Amino acid sequence: MAIQQPAPAPAPSEHVSTTAQPSYNFRAAAVVWFIVGAVKNPAARFDPATMTYVGSSGVMNSALWMRPDSGIASFAQLLAAKEKVVLGALNATSQDSMAPALLARNGVPVRVIRGYNSSAKVLLAIEQGEVPGIFHIVDGFAKRPDLIENKVVVPVLQTQPMFPGLPLLRDVIRASDRPLANLVLAGEEFGVLLAGPPAIPADRSALLRQAFTTMSDDKDYQADLARMDVPRGTPLAGDTIASMMRTLVETTTPDIAAAYERLKE
């Protein structure tokens, strides 16, 4: 079995999907390249709905984190802000930029400053008071738990029901934008995928999926993830991912794909 590591282009996914033998080539990848296929980007020559999924690192939770001393310690206070609230982000395609853009599309007074070269730099900027907030995965504070423990930042909105009493992102946007939210949040909801080409024989895919589940439950594997600061969500089984991916592709209409691209502006 050959494993292909992520590359800065959808080419490996294209190879696995369109030319790889059904028995041997697999791709370990963040879901972003599968989104390229879901939105029917001309650069992608693969259909993510047809690939064989072995498993993933699983669902994670993100939140909108704010410095309470900025005057915003709840989503209601954010909505009441008289001026747009600045959030730090990496780049136009990162979730810390696209999720706030989706909120802004729905009337939430936020704007994003992009260009930080790492989430750690954004967290440092927040700590130093340069920007008051960030949309960030909870596990992203693994190296800076003090920011949460000392309430330098507090969550005011979340993507999964983790923090009691906090509103969910999907509940504060228009119902018509929820398919768009599914696309924006796909990275955290699919996790890091292990995917192979279409038409892998059922007995082989079942064996691979069983092995992936066994690995995910292994304490040494979990300890390795913790040491490497790899986000650890709730692992997803391959058949679950396949069903989710088909739904994502089916619900990503041309209008949704166009709206997704506009969030990058």
Task: Give, region by region, the residue ranges found by the protein language model.
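Short helix-initiation/N-cap motifs at beta->coil->alpha
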Residues: 6-14, 113-128, 137-140, 239
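Extracytoplasmic "Venus flytrap"
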Residues: 1, 7-12, 87-95
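C-terminal lobe and pocket-closing loops
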Residues: 143-216, 248, 255, 264
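Hinge/capping helix and adjacent helix->loop/strand transition within the periplasmic-binding protein
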Residues: 17-24, 38-121, 125, 173-179, ...
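A ligand-binding cleft/hinge motif common to bilobed small-molecule-binding domains
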Residues: 30-44, 94-106, 120, 128, ...
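Structural recognition of the beta-strand scaffold that forms the well-ordered cores
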Residues: 4, 25-29, 86-89, 111-114, ...
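Mature extracytoplasmic/periplasmic domains
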Residues: 169, 206, 217, 221-244
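Extracellular/periplasmic bilobal clamshell ligand-binding domains
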Residues: 237-265
